[in-house]
């Protein structure tokens, strides 16, 4: 049987964590990644070179590569001294390869091949873009990193230039997908930013593949303050122009006082789930008692193994293929 074609849409840490888990399964992975980041090492490079943001792309390439390889470790290495302090070597390699090939998309393909990744990593657009936001009070905020600093409710986000075209490979992947997964990650700056690229939303909506949203566990200050799971989904649907999400994976776990206090100090709290409200809109809600893990310093994160297994199980419900058996359970 052919492998299931799973397309991931997003950016930031969330997408790379999910990709790292899914690479262990017998699926054909394509990650469509936002290129609107303008902070940190990525921002410095973009100030010098007018290229799409390399940072989120770098993280996903590393996640899909052989995690034990020296090349993969080198790709994620970050300098700490002198004039290149703060720069990731992977970002510099992407920038250098872009100069060599004169094409950001070609640079990503070349580096993906060098690192022997499982699957494909595709920028949502091959154009250098800036993400802006219109706040509910009408103020326009320019640049991704400035959006959450305003601590205002976001009405919508948009890209400059506004006529950017998608990577054709991204459109083809959406058309051919068996399952499309959005998130987890910053709602507006990592997920919805991809839908701002002309053609992405249309291809997503018209794809025959079921669509799944992986909800964040905690609200994000300055971006999703007070948002429920449904609020996250509603924001995605507003950008796309119509409802399309069929499944949502979300946490219903309760957290101890230490965890809640740590997040309250950052003006963040658990994303609330109203299962009946979601099911009323024909969204199939998937949860797990151990979807989230808590670190020693009381930070909550998706359990990579549990999340990727849930996504694969959903895919198996939809597609006839050979079930995956972990190597330690094979006879």
Report each predicted region and the residues it spans:
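Active-site gating loop/helix substructures
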Residues: 127-188
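Conserved phosphate- and dinucleotide-binding cores of soluble alpha/beta proteins
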Residues: 2, 21-27, 33-50, 166-167, ...
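Glycine-rich phosphate/diphosphate-binding loops and the adjacent beta-loop-alpha structural elements
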Residues: 74-103, 185-189, 218-224, 255, ...
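C-terminal functional extensions of proteins
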Residues: 226-331
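Structural beta-sheet core signal
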Residues: 8, 31-32, 213, 250
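Electropositive, gly/pro-rich neighborhoods at or near active sites that engage anionic ligands
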Residues: 36-152, 308-316, 325-330
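Hydrophobic/small residue at the entry helix of a nucleotide-binding pocket
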Residues: 13-14
